[in-house]
Design a protein with these regions (language model features):
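Conserved beta-strand in the GNAT
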Residues: 47, 53-62, 80, 85
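Conserved active-site tyrosine of GNAT-family acetyltransferases
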Residues: 130-132
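Conserved acetyl-CoA-binding loop-helix of GNAT-fold acetyltransferases
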Residues: 86, 92-105
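Conserved acetyl-CoA binding element of GNAT-fold acetyltransferases
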Residues: 72-88, 142
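Conserved beta-strand-loop-alpha-helix junction that forms the acyl-donor binding cleft
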Residues: 116-127, 145-148
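Active-site rim helix/loop that mediates acceptor-substrate recognition in acyltransferases
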Residues: 24-49
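A conserved beta-strand-loop-helix scaffold within acyl/acetyltransferase catalytic domains
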Residues: 50, 58-75
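A short beta-loop-alpha structural element at the N-terminal edge
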Residues: 1-16
Length: 148
């Protein structure tokens, strides 16, 4: 398995959109829709490759806190993870964890000290286990809804 950060090319864009379309079809996240070029452009892209084929991706962007809150100071830089995806047949094999770890090491080299992400999965117990127990993230907040 190879992990690397890549520039957006037409081929990579097409593969990312194909993966996100498959993810949309899984119906595993509330409100998830497949990505468009506009959703992906401008993000940093990290890939998991097996035999030169994309099997997972992570993309996100650098941002700064608009105002101080309980997690970061005003203007403190952080990396916001937009999406982390591994093909269904390869899940639970540590690929997502390794991909996240690769991205984290790259950010540490750049002196980035904070990573944020939100998730809209329907299987919150599994995803909290993954992010909290497997990746060592901390729980910040929860946004809940009830359709009536």
């Amino acid at each position: 398995m190879i992990f690397k950060e890549v520039e957006l090319t037409d081929k990579i864009l097409s593969e990312l959109i194909d993966c996100s379309e498959a993810w949309e079809q899984e119906n595993s996240c509330h409100g998830y829709r497949k990505n468009t070029e506009e959703d992906i452009k401008g993000n940093r892209i990290f890939l998991a490759l097996e035999n030169e084929q994309m099997v997972g991706y992570l993309f996100g962007f650098m941002d700064k806190g608009e105002r101080k809150n309980s997690i970061y100071e005003k203007d403190e830089p952080f990396f916001e993870v937009e999406e982390l995806y591994v093909k269904p047949e390869l899940r639970s094999k540590g690929i997502g964890k390794q991909l996240f770890g690769y991205m984290e090491e790259k950010l540490k080299e750049e002196k980035v000290e904070l990573i944020l992400l939100s998730t809209a999965t329907k299987n919150y117990k599994a995803i909290l286990h993954f992010y909290l127990d497997e990746l060592g993230m901390e729980f910040w907040s929860a946004r809940l809804f009830k359709r009536i």
